[in-house]
Amino acid sequence: MTDQIQRFLFDETNVRGEIVGLQQAYADVLDKHAYPAAVRRQLGELLGAVALLTETVKLDGTVSLEVRGQGAVRLLMAESNPGGELRAIARLDDEAALPEENASLTALVGEAQIVITLDPRDGQRYQGIVAVEADTLAACLEDYFARSEQLATRLWLAADGDRAAGMLLQQLPDDASNRDPDAWERTVHLATTLSDAELLDLDQRELLYRLFHEEQARVFEPKALRFGCTCTRERIASALHGLGADELRHIVREQGAVETQCHFCHSHYRFTAADIETLIESPGAGAPTLH
């Protein structure tokens, strides 16, 4: 499976879509952690979903998708940007029993919320929140779109621990170019025949042809996707500054330096006592040089 996302639309209708497949990027996320099988699968669906959402909103910034719960899994989070970089992480309750391999989303997270964050480079951050009231991520996201009175949207997501894939259909606002008022109901009906195995196994163009060969579908050039972490020394320094001078100096006295690790990519960052003093005195001057 090639790590890529493709847009498509149906001529003379107000229906558009996207299809995504992930294998290497998915493996790069999972290789850094020893997650249970059910968590690996849910993270795959989350990665597929955030890639689809990023392509949908076309934001110059980052899109993140979080599931915050009270169950054995406390957090599932995936993030994407317009450059095609993806990353994801899960946090488990250390005292809870490991989830069963085929556990549903609700079985993993218990009472939970889904938080969608749009963080543009320039402009105001936006967050949308919806309660987890369905067993699948796709159904929860469809519920979010329905409740927020946005465009009618349907999603199909699948992951098996090795590969992840997804498809999105969306009904755009009606205009004069739409000469087929029944197109939305018809294309959704065709897509409901899609199985997880087909979504994971078939080439994207083959899959679209199999589903929509009687429609006038126009498929655009694919966009490559990959694992990429946005952590930097400057961002880590900014986060450390939030701990406050007293706490930072206490850590230095106890440990000789402040050391931390990115949860996403496991990059290691070390700040000496001198680095910390520079950070405290001049928080906006940039991160001290790596030692």
Swiss-Prot record:
Location of this chain's protein in the cell: Cytoplasm
Modified how: Under oxidizing conditions two disulfide bonds are formed involving the reactive cysteines. Under reducing conditions zinc is bound to the reactive cysteines and the protein is inactive.
This protein's name: 33 kDa chaperonin
Highest taxon, organism lineage: Bacteria
Any one GO molecular function term: protein folding chaperone
Known function: Redox regulated molecular chaperone. Protects both thermally unfolding and oxidatively damaged proteins from irreversible aggregation. Plays an important role in the bacterial defense system toward oxidative stress.
Organism per entry: Chromohalobacter salexigens (strain ATCC BAA-138 / DSM 3043 / CIP 106854 / NCIMB 13768 / 1H11)
Record key words, sorted: Chaperone, Cytoplasm, Disulfide bond, Redox-active center, Zinc
InterPro entries referenced in this protein's UniProt entry, alphabetically: Heat_shock_Hsp33, Heat_shock_Hsp33_C, Heat_shock_Hsp33_N, Hsp33_helix_hairpin_bin_dom_sf
Pfam families attached to this UniProt entry: HSP33 (PF01430)
GO BP annotations, alphabetical order: protein refolding
GO-annotated cellular components: cytoplasm
Family named by the database record: Belongs to the HSP33 family.
Disulphides: C229-C231, C262-C265
